[in-house]
Amino acid sequence: MKNLSLFLIFILFSFQNSFSFQNSIKPLLLAPVFSDHMVLQQKSDVSIWGSTSPNQDVFVAASWDEKVITKSDKDGEWNIKIKTPSYGGPYNISVISLKDTILLDDVLIGEVWLASGQSNMQWKLSNRLVNQEQEIANANYNQIRMFTVPLDLTGEKIKNSKWKISNSENVKLFSAVGYFFAKRLHVDINVPIGIINTSWGGTRVEAWTSLKKLRTLNATKDIISNLDLNADNNQNNKKVNDANA
């Protein structure tokens, strides 16, 4: 009853707003990691986030009868938690703003793992591999999916990244370690497995850690403080140079 009331409130709110107001609202966007064919962690409070215009209601409805509503902040960012059931699917999730609706289809609930590391984790099944042809040909596991973060510092390529279902074509670009881990786990516990591949050869773990966190760690806080100081000095020097130009 509570979920139904939330839904009715959202619908009534939508009809009360004028079409001219709707046209001024920014498009509803989801973080790229949320796409068709994704896997969400079972029996958890899972965060879903994205952006729209500031101070706008965002309604999320999952087909396992979970409905929640939130509001974007002053910058248009929003983040909401939904409760997931035990493993299963496929399900769908609707994300609704005043202007847009995004439908996520073929969503599975299971176990989600992060595959992070350097070149060993990055190594693809399309690279040299023992029994490569046989492994690729037999890689048709509908309940194994992988999301691969592209090697791109601009943040642009990830906008087009999607979850991929394991099959003899998609698996060629999967992390080999990530795939074989997922395959073994899926065979052993018989639940959907999602792998988020964030590997990049030669990178240090600090590069994958937020500045906020690095400032709190004994091993890195002094280094970050020096970087902050250098950045401030560079900014001050730029202001002086601009003033003298």
Question: Where are each of the predicted segments found?
Answer:
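Bacterial Sec-dependent N-terminal signal peptides
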Residues: 1-25
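Cell-envelope and extracellular/periplasmic
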Residues: 21-245
